[in-house]
Amino acid sequence: MKTLKALLLLLAVTASVLLEAKPKVRIIATGGTIAGISQSAASTVYKPGQVGIQTLIEAVPQILDLADISGEQLVNIGSQDMNDAVWLRLAKRINELLDDDDCDAVVVTHGTDTMEETAYFLNLTIKSDKPVILVGSMRPSNALSADGPANLYNAVATAISPQSRGMGVLCCMNNQLLDAKTVIKTHTLDSDTFKGGPSGILGYVHNGEAFYLQRPVNKHTVQTAFDVSDLEELPKVGIVYGYANASPLPLQAFVDAGFDGVVLAGVGDGNIYKDVFDAAVKAQKKGVQIVRSSRCSAGPTSLDGEVDDAKYHFVASLDLNPQKARVLLMLALTKTRDWKRIQQYFEEY
């Protein structure tokens, strides 16, 4: 009888511990405005990447009620200084963490300038369906009405939601949940700067709970062909901006510098000024992959529209803007130099 009571007591204690166990969330800090400090609380002049991960966590103690939180500082930079080397380190570290049963989700604090690019890169290279959430702020940590603390709280709340699993990499900003592929920064100052493009937001956060309205359409994370685990560098890809009477010199400079690919941010439907077009044809013949995109803020770049892509072996970016087309082209070039296969990647991802 005593043995039975002891066993029941042990089971009760074990059940209690299991019920009280919180999800384990790792926060990786990379800098940005969320870690910035301004000259005064009312100033918009500030230095990004001044506050460390521990200070960020201590500023939002409420996240400790949501999850078992731990943090690490990968870098502490303004995201205008984000680069391929940091991307590779970040992707490898997240994959390492999520491969461990002791980590349920990862939150990445990041500057907003290039957050959409980092999010898309991770969306193509993370090999787990566990939640990965990018979060930042538009106001520095000591500003009046700083948005960083609320954004970080919402990001952790999203990370622990069972509904977030399998959603790909997300950006959590201003109470909204945005798809890594479609998210875009649209304003230099507004806290509501991030938008979801024509497809809109994936969901929102309210009272510490994530609510989803739709799922991502394109393949991501575990569904992609890209593996960066053994990569030490990425192919070199540049972007050339289109405009009236555009010069071919920037494109020629990329070719002369040995770049592997160039994204043309063309006018309208990815159209290219004649001198730049001629330079692009020559570049493609030299083995430099050309991707046509558009400088327009919305709308796809049509395959074989006004430009005969099949004839010149160009790739159309479809619904990717120039900066995200660059990300996908870099990864595509780690797998193939065949323009037809690269076009398929743009259709899939």
Residue ranges and their predicted role:
Residues 22-23, 28, 52, 56-63, ...:
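Accessory alpha-helical/coil subdomains and C-terminal extensions
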Residues 108-130, 272-281:
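Short Gly/Thr/Asp-enriched flexible loops that form oxyanion-binding sites at enzyme active sites
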Residues 1-8:
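Bacterial N-terminal signal peptides that target proteins for export
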Residues 119-150, 156-160, 285-294:
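Short, acidic/small-residue loops that bind anionic groups at enzyme active sites
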Residues 135-207:
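Internal gly/pro-rich beta-alpha loop/helix module
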Residues 8-20:
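Hydrophobic h-region of N-terminal signal peptides that target proteins for export
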